[in-house]
Amino acid sequence: KKILLLGTYIKRSANLYFLSQEYEFLPQQELRLTIDEAVRVINVCGTECSVVYHTTGPMRATEVARLLDLLKVVTEAAMGGLYSLFISVSDGEMDLSVECAAELSFLASPDVTVQQEDGLWLVRTRIGGGSGA
């Protein structure tokens, strides 16, 4: 399971790297392809996972890569006891609602807020550079 997940992240990260060398902004479709592939693999690994998008325009390639990196760190940290993961992406932020046995407070940083409520972790990061900014 871990190898499948890691392989997916490596593939998508490499793809985003090459795209970012050519384009500053990526269309919504590329964001969706990136996150949707991760969601499919997380589901294949036996964790309930879904995503909803509230995006209205292109996003900086560097932001898409950063969102994928955060998703990777969260899933790796929680992998042994990850029960469910719900992802919400808008132009201004990405929210991860994580039900897991792991402690996720270490993820907190100036760019990432982490809260635990009713047994769920809410991991949130702001997104800059959406829709032509």
Enumerate the language-model features and the residues they cover.
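Flexible, glycine-/charge-rich segments associated with ATP-binding catalytic modules
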Residues: 4-6, 38, 84, 106-133
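Helix-loop-beta hinge of the Bergerat
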Residues: 29-63
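Generic structural motif
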Residues: 47-51, 85-87, 112-114
